[in-house]
UniProtKB/Swiss-Prot annotation:
Residues 39-110 form the Peptidase A2 domain. Residues 167-356 form the Reverse transcriptase domain. PROSITE patterns: ASP_PROT_RETROV (PS50175), ASP_PROTEASE (PS00141), INTEGRASE (PS50994), INTEGRASE_DBD (PS51027), RNASE_H_1 (PS50879), RT_POL (PS50878), ZF_INTEGRASE (PS50876). It comes from Ovine maedi visna related virus (strain South Africa) (SA-OMVV). During replicative cycle of retroviruses, the reverse-transcribed viral DNA is integrated into the host chromosome by the viral integrase enzyme. RNase H activity is associated with the reverse transcriptase. Pfam families: dUTPase, Integrase_Zn, RNase_H, rve, RVP, RVT_1, RVT_connect. Residues 551-673 form the RNase H type-1 domain. Zn(2+) binds at H817, H821, C845, C848. A zinc finger (Integrase-type) spans 808-849. This is Pol polyprotein. Belongs to the retroviral Pol polyprotein family. It catalyses: Endohydrolysis of RNA in RNA/DNA hybrids. Three different cleavage modes: 1. sequence-specific internal cleavage of RNA. Human immunodeficiency virus type 1 and Moloney murine leukemia virus enzymes prefer to cleave the RNA strand one nucleotide away from the RNA-DNA junction. 2. RNA 5'-end directed cleavage 13-19 nucleotides from the RNA end. 3. DNA 3'-end directed cleavage 15-20 nucleotides away from the primer terminus; 3'-end directed exonucleolytic cleavage of viral RNA-DNA hybrid; dUTP + H2O = dUMP + diphosphate + H(+); DNA(n) + a 2'-deoxyribonucleoside 5'-triphosphate = DNA(n+1) + diphosphate. CDD domains: trimeric_dUTPase (cd07557).
Amino acid sequence: SNITAGKQQEGATCGAVRAPYVVTEAPPKIDIKVGTNWKKVLVDTGADRTIVRYHDNSGIPTGRIKLQGIGGIIEGEKWDKVVIQYKEKRIEGTIVVLPSSPVEVLGRDNMAKLDIGIIMANLEEKKIPITQVKLKEGCKGPHIAQWPLTQEKLEGLKEIVDKLEKEGKVGRAPPHWTCNTPIFCIKKKSGKWRMLIDFRELNKQTEDLAEAQLGLPHPGGLQKKKHVTILDIGDAYFTIPLYEPYRPYTCFTMLSPNNLGPCTRYYWKVLPQGWKLSPSVYQFTMQEILRDWIAKHPMIQFGIYMDDIYIGSDLDIMKHREIVEELASYIAQYGFMLPEEKRQEGYPAKWLGFELHPEKWRFQKHTLPEIKEGTITLNKLQKLVGDLVWRQSLIGKSIPNILKLMEGDRALQSERRIELRHVKEWEECRRKLAEMEGNYYDEEKDVYGQIDWGDKAIEYIVFQERGKPLWVNVVHNIKNLSQSQQIIKAAQKLTQEVIIRIGKIPWILLPGKEEDWILELQIGNITWMPSFWSCYRGSIRWKKRNVITEVVEGPTYYTDGGKKNGKGSLGFIASTGVKFRKHEEGTNQQLELRAIEEACKQGPEKMNIVTDSRYAYEFMRRNWDEEVIKNPIQARIMKLVHDKEQIGVHWVPGHKGIPQNEEIDKYISEIFLAREGSGILPKRAEDAGYDLICPQEVCIPAGQVRKIPINLRINLKEDQWAMVGTKSSFASKGVFVQGGIIDSGYQGIIQVVVYNSNDKEVIIPQGRKFAQLILMPLIHEDLEAWGETRRTERGNQGFGSTGAYWIENIPLAEEDHSKWHQDAGSLHLDFGIPRTAAEDIVQQCEVCQENKMPSTIRGSNRRGIDHWQVDYTHYEDKIILVWVETNSGLIYAERVKGETGQEFRIMTIRWYGLFAPKSLQSDNGPAFVAEPTQLLMKYLGITHTTGIPWNPQSQALVERTHQTLKNTIEKFVSMFASFDSAIAAALITLNIKRKGGLGTSPMDIFIFNKEQQRIQQQSTRNQSKFRFCYYRVRKRGHPGEWLGPTQVLWEGEGAIVIKDKNLEKYLVIAKKDVKFIPQPKEIQTE
C-alpha cells in the first residue's frame, strides 16, 4: 500500500513524487492531539501510516523507517506508544516524523483505533493525470556513450543521483534497457554541484506534443483587482510521474569513480529537466488538475505560466487569503509544494518580469541603459536590444537603424560603430519607456486595435480608451510581402493576442479605405480575418506605389498578345534575350494582359514592361483602389506587382517603326511549333532533340514490340518534319525504336514503337526519358512537285521515339547515393546508368543540393606518387587533421584535441603505418616545424618540406580538400551518433565511392600505384637473383636420373618451371624432384 511521500526542505536537489492514491473529493481535515500538540491533519485512507512534521518526543523512539511510495523510498523517524486524541477518544498509536512532508496525515493505522471512517467520492480524481508520450515512428531511442568525467565531478554526481534515487525520482534500470543519454555536472556559485543531462538525441527522436500554452500571459489582459497573490510551485517537474512505457528511453549511466566498480544504470520516473516535453507535459498536467478548481471560483481572476500562479480578486482580504489557502491545500494533495518564502501578497507584485500596481503595470526593470557614440561589441549590443524587444509591448518603438547595425559579422566580439542617429533612436525609446505605463482591462468596454505604418515596421496599439493603451507592439518587415499584406498579417497577430489575453474579438482600425482592404483580402489568399473591422482616414503610406511610368533599372520586357492568323497567341521578348510565346484562347484584351502576367511571373524584382495596348497600359497605371477588380487576370497581375520592388510601364503606339515591338509582333504571329501535354521536356541548347517521357510503367516481354502513346500532341510548321529517335542508353541495352518519321503538318498524338531484342522482359518506369524528338527543316530539292501532293497514311497512328532502360540499376544507384552522396559521374560509372539519370539522382537529393562541393583549384603544386600534403582544419568547434596524397587525391583525416606537436607526431606515426609515404608538404605551423617533428620525419625517412609563407598555391590541394571534406561531413553528421563516424563515412565516400574521369577512385589509383611499385621492385629483385637447380623427370611415378644444372624460370609454392634442353620443352617439376644450387661458375663466365 502507498504512503504519502512528502517534499524535501528548501535547498534539497528535488522533491519527491507524491503517490497518486485515492482521496475524497474535498479531503477532510480534522483536529487531533499528538502527544501534547494539537494538529490539523488530513484524513487519508490511501496512507497506511500517520505522518507528522514535528513531534514533542513523547512515546518510544524505535529508529528510522523507510516508507515506500510511488515516488520511491523516503526515510522518517518512527515513534511507538504516542498518545493520540480525537474528540473524547484517546489511544496509543504509532507515528512517523517526516519534517519535509507538505501535509500532516492521519493514516489507516490509527483511523481504525479512533473509529474514524469516511465515505469516498470520485475515487480516481486526485491522481496526477499522466500524459502519454512516445518516440517518433521508427526511432529506437538514444544510444550515446557516457563520456569520461573527473573524479570530483563523479563524486558530485553520485551524491545527487543517490539523493534522487532515495526520493524516488530515478530508479535502477534493468540490464535489457540499453538506451543511454550522457550526464555531466557543473559547480554553481554556491559551491554545490548541479546535474545536467544532454537530452539532444532523445529530444530529436521524441514525437512532439501540442504546446499547452501559446506565449506568455500579459498583464494588459488582466482586469484591475483589489488584492493580488503570486504563488510559486516548487520542484514542479519532479512532482509529475513520467509515462511508464517511455521510461526505458531515459536511462543514463553513473560511472564508478576511478573504475573501482561496475557502472550503475538509472532511468527517470519523473519529468527530467532538459527534456523537451517536460514543459508541455507539466502544462497539460496543471490544466487538468486546476480546471475544476477554476470553474468553482468564478470570482477569482486566475493566471498560470509554468510554475508562477497569479490570483486576483475584489473580495475582502480575509476571504481572498482563505481562497489562496484553499488553492494551496488543493495543489498540495497532488504533492506540489508552494514555498512560503516565494509567496507574494499584495501590490507591487512581481509576475513574469512585470511589476503589477493597483492601477497600472510596468516592467520590473523599467529603465534602459544609455548608449553613447563610439564602438560596442556585438555581444553587448545584442543584450541591449534584447532588453528593449522585451519591452516593446509597452513602448512600441521600432529601432531600424540599430537593427541594421547588428547585421554583418556574426562573431560576438566583433565591433560596431554607434553614431548619433543610433543614440537618438535609443533615447526616444528610453524616454517613452520612462513615461509609459500599461493599463488593465475593463471587461465592460470594447477593445480596439489601431494599426499604423511606422518606420520600416508596423506598429499597433491595443486600447479601450484613447491615450490609455493596454499594450502596444511592433511587427518588423517580412521579406517578399507587400506592405498591405504585412498590415493584414499584423492585424491577425493583434487579434490573436487579444483573444488569448482577454478572450474578446477586438475592433481593428486599418488605415485607408474599406474597398482597398476588401480587394487585398481577395487577392492575398487571406484565410482568416476578424469580422469586426473598420477603417480610419489615417495614413495610407501602405500604398506601395511601385508601378511608375519612368524607366526603372532592370531588364525591359516587350509584350504582345492577340489573335494572330486566326489563332490566339501571347508572348514577350526581354532585353536579356529571354523569349516566351504560347498559343491560348481568349479576347485580344485578355491576351494582352496575359502577356504582361507572364512577363511579371518570369521577370525580376525591378523591370520595365512595354506594351502597345492602351487598355493594358491604363490598367497598369490605374490606382487599383478605384474599384473592386473582378477580372481574374487583373487580380493575378495585381498580386504579382505587389511582390515586386518596382515596375516601369511604357506604351508605344502599334508596332510600326519600333524595331523591338515589330520583333515581338512577328515572333508571336508565326505559326510556331506548339505542343499540348506533358510528354516532352524543354530542350537544352546543346541537345539535338527534345526528350520524350514515358507516361506510365511499361513492360515489354522478350522479343516483342509495344506501341506506347505519350501525353503529347504537336503542331509542326509547314516547313518542318520530325523524327523520333532512340536514346543510345536504351540501344546499348538491346531496346530499340522502330520507325519514327513525323510528316510536316501532322497534328496527331505521338506514339513510340519500341522493340525489346533481349531474351528477358524489360520494364520502362513512368517518367523516364525514353526517346527523343528531333526536328528537321523540310527540303524538297528535285522531288518538290511530288512532295506537294503527297499523302500521309498515318492519321492518328503517329510515331515517336525511344531509348530503353535496364532499370534495375536505378533504385540501386539511388539507395547507394542516399548512403554515400557520391557525385553523378561516380554513379554513372558504378551502376552503368546514363549520366543524365545520375545527375537527376544527385539533383533530387536535398542533402547534396544544400552542400555543394567547391570548384577545383588549379595550381602549380608539386604532385607525385607517395607525396602528401597535411594541414589542420576546423569544423564548428572541432579540429580535424587532414592528409591528402597529391597523386591520387586519397584523403586521411582524424579528429584531434588540439594543434600540439606531440599529438601531430602520434598521428604521423599512424599515417606512416597505414600508407608508407615518401614525402610530405605542410605549412609553417608550430606543430609541423618543431624540432622533434623534424627528427621524427628523418627517422621515418620522409622528405618534409614546408610551404612558402603567404603563398596559398603551395597548400592549394589540401586547402581544397578541407572544403570537400567538410561539405561531405555535413551530409553525414545527422546520420551518425558520433562525429568520428561521420568523418569515417565521409572518407569512404571520397576515397572509395568517388570516381574520377577515368572511372577510378582515389583508393583505386593509390592501390594501383603501390602494386606497380611492388611489381617493379620484384622484377628488379628477380633479375638480380637467378636460381639454378638439378631436376629429375618421373615416368609412371618412378624418378629418372638427375639432370642439369639449369636455370629456374619460375618458382611456385609446390613446383618450378624449367626448360629441358634436350626436348626443347618447358616442364613443370614438383619440388620433391628438385635440388637448388648456387649459380654454377661456368655459366657465370658465359
